């Protein structure tokens, strides 16, 4: 089942038995997530922050096993990770992380992209809104963006989405850099932060 879908894309999904169908579903979900999160912040930046919205450059998927993967400030991005590069204002993710998370369902694909997009928002919003736990704030803002996109009609949020994301975070906790509790917080902390954003919106995530 496609857990989240942009309304103009419609169904399609990740329930196909063939690997090719699953790959198509993953790429569709990635594209959907990018569109929905960008659309939310484009429409609502001025509701929360002064100035103009500046979306990150989307480098998209890379293969973390490749020596030719992207670099940020001279350092190669990590395998099984997703990143926002502050100095170059881009986001990118290891396709292998997305494939790993997809075994649990497609929910975490949306969280990964909304989380990294939130880091780009943190980099451009006034510093007074930052909190010390920037990773948990990004989880909160990511949840707010996805829920906001659902309220706007850009995204369809189905029953059980939050539970699916929670199960994926617990299942992958400590297995990848993106789910490393030392850097990002425990699975429980991340789930609580994400759900705060979903329930109460962007303002609940800000200092």
What are the language-model segments listed below?
Residues 61-92:
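Catalytic zinc-binding patch centered on the HExxH motif and its immediate surroundings
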Residues 150-207:
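Long, well-structured alpha-helical subdomains associated
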């Amino acid at each position: 089942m496609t857990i989240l879908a942009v309304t103009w894309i419609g169904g399609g999904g990740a329930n196909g038995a063939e690997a090719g169908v699953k790959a198509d579903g993953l790429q569709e979900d990635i594209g959907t997530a990018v569109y929905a999160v960008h659309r939310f912040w484009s429409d609502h930046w001025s509701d929360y922050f002064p100035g103009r919205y500046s979306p990150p450059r989307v480098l998209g998927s890379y293969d973390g096993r490749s020596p030719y993967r992207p670099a940020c400030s001279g350092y190669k991005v990590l395998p099984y990770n997703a990143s926002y590069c502050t100095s170059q204002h881009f986001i990118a993710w290891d396709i292998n992380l997305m494939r790993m998370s997809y075994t649990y369902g497609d929910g975490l694909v949306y969280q990964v992209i909304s989380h990294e997009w939130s880091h780009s928002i943190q980099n451009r919003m006034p510093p007074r809104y930052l909190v010390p736990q920037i990773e948990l704030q990004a989880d909160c803002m990511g949840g707010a963006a996805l829920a906001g996109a659902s309220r706007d009609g850009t995204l369809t949020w189905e029953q059980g989405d939050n539970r699916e994301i929670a199960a994926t975070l617990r299942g992958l906790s400590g297995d990848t850099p993106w789910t490393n509790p030392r850097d990002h917080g425990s699975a429980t902390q991340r789930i609580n932060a994400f759900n705060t954003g979903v329930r109460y919106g962007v303002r609940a995530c800000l200092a």
